Amino acid sequence: MIPEVSNEASQPAAHRQENVDPNEIAKFDAVAARWWDLEGEFKPLHHINPLRLDYILERSGGLFGKNVLDVGCGGGILAESMAREGAKVTGLDMGAEPLAVARLHALESGVMLAYHQQTVEEHAEAHPGAYDVVTCMEMLEHVPDPASIVRACARLVKPGGEVFFSTLNRNPKAWLMAIVGAEYVLRMVPRGTHDITKFIKPAELLGWVDDTPLREQHIIGLHYNPLRDRFYLGGNVDVNYMLHTRRQA
């Protein structure tokens, strides 16, 4: 299978854009060319990706031979790593530039996966129950209606399948660490990457999950030690956190 980007041109423009923030798309389009630069704006994503992947592998029982959907795949960092584990990966994103970068990198790396420029809501209409595993990492805080994303992910996964979310908690500590610290002091990510008003409390995310056939399985925090320049997982979910859910059989 040759990696491809589907523009889904047949979909009405208004429908395609209903849960998309054009400012967020433009923000990531502008830096997409540096997505795979290990020392660039996406350095933190490259650093946390092994943690994300290991968590997904452990909680899902492995990905080999499974149909996996990566929602908000961007330039393909997580999507490629899951494909290397033997998964049949599809990546979704609404940013044309990140998808172009993802497609090119996959071709250069010889990794087999497919990319589509399509909203997750549209994909859920066309492919309900098509996936064994769905991942939605660092994406919910960048859309107008994150609850809609959760519902679509629940629709896309098979009964008994796994859905993984990651996002940022909304509180003063998260503002201090993720915005003041990461964007202004340490300059780990570009200024303006995050908006505290779009951060999501775990209780809010769990509430949206409870309104679907998904059920919480595990939640864990993602932490950064600036002295050692190292990310690690821990029980505290005050800032970044990952949630593992499973669709009821």
Curated annotation (Swiss-Prot):
Gene3D superfamilies: Vaccinia Virus protein VP39. S-adenosyl-L-methionine binds at residues 52, 72, 93, 137. GO terms for biological process: methylation. The keyword GTP-binding does not apply. NCBIfam families: UbiG. It holds the Pfam family Methyltransf_23. It comes from the Bacteria. This is Ubiquinone biosynthesis O-methyltransferase. GO terms for molecular function: 2-polyprenyl-6-hydroxyphenol methylase activity; 3-demethylubiquinol 3-O-methyltransferase activity; polyprenyldihydroxybenzoate methyltransferase activity. The gene is ubiG. Pathway: Cofactor biosynthesis; ubiquinone biosynthesis. CDD domains: AdoMet_MTases (cd02440). It is an enzyme of class 2 (transferase). It catalyses: a 3-demethylubiquinol + S-adenosyl-L-methionine = a ubiquinol + S-adenosyl-L-homocysteine + H(+); a 3-(all-trans-polyprenyl)benzene-1,2-diol + S-adenosyl-L-methionine = a 2-methoxy-6-(all-trans-polyprenyl)phenol + S-adenosyl-L-homocysteine + H(+).
